UniProtKB/Swiss-Prot annotation:
Residues 294-303 have a biased composition (Pro residues). Residues 94-105 have a biased composition (Low complexity). GO terms for cellular component: plasma membrane. This is GTP-binding protein REM 2. InterPro entries: P-loop_NTPase, RGK_GTP-binding_reg, Sigma_54_int_dom_ATP-bd_1, Small_GTPase. The modification Phosphoserine is found at residues 27, 296. It is found in: Cell membrane. PROSITE patterns: RAS. Binds GTP saturably and exhibits a low intrinsic rate of GTP hydrolysis.
Length: 341
């Protein structure tokens, strides 16, 4: 015997079943159920870790994949919903432009292939870019600007009947990136041209500081360094004499040459001389079987050499050249000859 209460309970049970069935039928096929959400939550950590191991999070639909040439810092991997600005951190490596050519991993291969890298150093306004552009146009059609770089030039030249590839980098001044880029230049160059203007004594006085920074960063290398007095055609505006430039070169154990990038005077001699200096110093290192700098039995040579250069630079800047004029004359006698050590 069924009572009204039993009838109501049966009706309620049937209503609940119908509602549940209707709810399942009304759900779109693409909408995840709670069970599917649980499965996705279980799978997300493993998938995310796998993507992080490969270098970054999975790209969102419609968003192009990031190039794999530069690793993304972990803090940017966590910003899943934000665009990553590649200038937010100092780049450590690059696969295009000048930074790729500067990679230290290619140094040995570059030497075998006869590729020499020459860095232009010096203060702003001394004519580095004009020198680089002049180098790029020495042979017309045979010169070309490197791809993806505005300040790097590469060309094949014949020096002493042997063809080499010479790459000239005018990237010493690059705005906010100048600090780390300058250090990278100092570590990877094969020869260094420290350019000053003969019409600007301040740029001339900065030469010892630049050279000391270079040799402090690479104390175990016999680096070819040429002091370049540019704008020699501006005779009426000259502030640095030829003799002063040679004296400084003799003091700092460098080569010296005066050029006029505007008139293409001595520009060919400069870059061919840089190639000769690289060959001569590498040949001397191979012949001696060790680093050519003098060594001391009481300790390593680099600190002593750096200290000596500092003292010499101070003596020069303190106007002590006249007292040692004979010594400097002997040291600077061949500093203008780029075909000898």
């Amino acid at each position: 015997m069924h009572t009204d209460l039993d009838t109501d309970m049966d009706a309620d049970t049937e209503t609940v079943a119908l509602c549940s069935s209707s709810s399942r039928q009304a759900s779109p096929s693409g909408t995840p159920t709670p069970e599917a959400d649980t499965t996705l939550l279980k799978q997300k950590p493993e998938k995310l870790l796998a993507e992080l191991d490969r270098g970054g999070p999975p790209p969102a639909p419609g968003v192009p994949r990031r190039r794999g040439s530069m690793p993304v810092p972990y803090k940017h991997q966590l910003r899943r919903a934000q665009a990553v600005d590649e200038l937010d951190w100092p780049p450590q490596a690059s696969s295009s432009g000048s930074s790729d050519s500067l990679g230290s991993g290619e140094a040995a291969l570059a030497q075998k292939d006869g590729v020499f890298k020459v860095m232009l150093l010096g203060e702003s306004g001394v004519g580095k870019s004009t020198l680089a552009g002049t180098f790029g146009g020495l042979q017309g059609d045979n010169a070309h600007e490197m791809e993806n770089s505005e300040d790097t030039y590469e060309r094949r030249i014949m020096v002493d009947k042997e063809e080499v590839t010479l790459i000239v980098y005018d990237i010493w001044e690059q705005g906010d990136a100048g600090g780390w880029l300058q250090d990278h230049c100092l570590q990877t160059g094969d020869a260094f041209l420290i350019v000053f203007s003969v019409t600007d004594r301040r740029s001339f006085s900065k030469v010892p500081e630049t050279l000391l920074r270079l040799r402090a960063g690479r104390p175990h290398h016999d680096l070819p360094v040429i002091l370049v007095g540019n704008k020699s055609d501006l005779a009426r505006s000259r502030e640095v004499s030829l003799e002063e430039g040679r004296h400084l070169a003799g003091t700092l154990s460098c080569k010296h040459i005066e050029t006029s990038a505007a008139l293409h005077h001595n520009t060919r001699e400069l870059f061919e001389g840089a190639v000769r200096q690289i060959r001569l110093r590498r040949g001397r290192g191979h012949a001696g079987g060790q680093r050519p700098e003098p060594s001391s039995p009481d300790g390593p040579a680099p600190p002593t050499r750096r200290e000596s250069l500092t003292k010499k630079a101070k003596r020069f800047l303190a106007n002590l050249v006249p007292r040692n004029a004979k010594f400097f004359k002997q040291r600077s006698r061949s500093c203008h000859d780029l075909s000898v050590l």
